[in-house]
Amino acid sequence: MCLSLHPSTRWRRRPPCRAIVICLLCLVGLAGGAGAQTRRRRLDKPARKPARSAPAPLQRAPEVPQPVGSALAAPLRVCAGGDVTLGTNLDLAWERAADDSMRRVYGLSPAPDSLARQLSPLFAGADLALINVEGAIGDGPAPRKCKRSSHSCFAFRQPTSTAEALRRAFDSTTQVVGNVANNHSHDAGGEGRETTIALLEQAGVHVTGVDTLATPVALPSGDTVAVLGFYTDASTPDARDLAAVHRYVSRAVDRWGTVIVTMHLGAEGPTAQRTRNANEIFLKESRGNPVAFADAAFNAGATLVIGHGPHVLRAGEWHGDRLVLYSLGNLLTYGPFKLHDPTDRGAVACATIDSVRHVASAELRATKQIWTGVLQPDSTARAFRLVDSLSALDFPETGVTVDSTGALGRRIPRSAADRTPR
């Protein structure tokens, strides 16, 4: 029975028809409330609107949680690279010039498959490949960020075939993870970001950096590890909120045991090679404190932290048997970049995580971009010397060493006398 309060404050029965309507509305309201409660069960992961014209993501079998105390069944080989942009469909002036040079000078096509094939040898032997997807993926009208006549506007939207090209670039047994927690995933707007996520997932690429929940990755060994991406923005897990970083990583460790963290933060460009324990500013924006971020992630139980965002190589540092590489630089960036030393140098980092979740060994594979979208192994191994020297400068006690083969080692601590100020 539906009742209403009469102006005389006495309860009166409503006419039957109106009562039925009001009751139905009450039921709808209750159902809506129940739906709202269901949606609130995952407070840290707001529901995403389905993207227009984007394929539905593939359904995967649920991964099995790994208790914290359990060991990995087999060593895990992780290879990670920095920023990757596989082509563009924005039809800007720089793109037309770059396409012409690629075809005339290098005999290459700017199509995503052609670009992505250059990544394959750099990730050989990886059980898990991790890259930063620097830009949106989609089609349709171009975003308004750049004018068609632009030669230096940094907006990236890659063709829809990019997602499948990225997956095909790696061995079928390699689990591929793409990070979208970065400052260019919104280059086609919020809807474009949703389309990017959907296309990657449909292609079989795991996506991280979408929200505060780690991305579980099931491995052929039967193990499941998790990857969690951060950027300095409220629409992604915010790397500047260190208490939240600790909370999200700790939650992932409790559930999955082995957690790999990727961070897109720090100032950008040739003057941003140094890593200091301080908040970094770029274009008047706070880009976070990479050192404090890594500390928070390791204190929460992360095994490996991979950095990108500065577009240059930075130092690496040991935290006991765990490892952070603060920036791997540009890997394969098809865009209006000025590619000269040091922005043309990058590296793929490969680390072996043993059964007790320690980094047993690690190495760098040096790369060089000789033209936008044209990548080759760096025979001069410039990346090795850069990372080694930057690590000595920024972390003289805990920084990595890099030998002539790219293998990462530990520094011999200076004696107390050597550390005494003179």
Q: Could you tell me what each predicted segment is?
A:
Residues 19-29:
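Bacterial N-terminal signal peptides
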Residues 32-35:
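Sec/Tat signal peptide C-region and signal peptidase I cleavage site
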Residues 6, 37-422:
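Acidic, metal/ion-coordinating pockets
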Residues 1-14:
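N-terminal secretory signal peptides that target proteins for export/translocation
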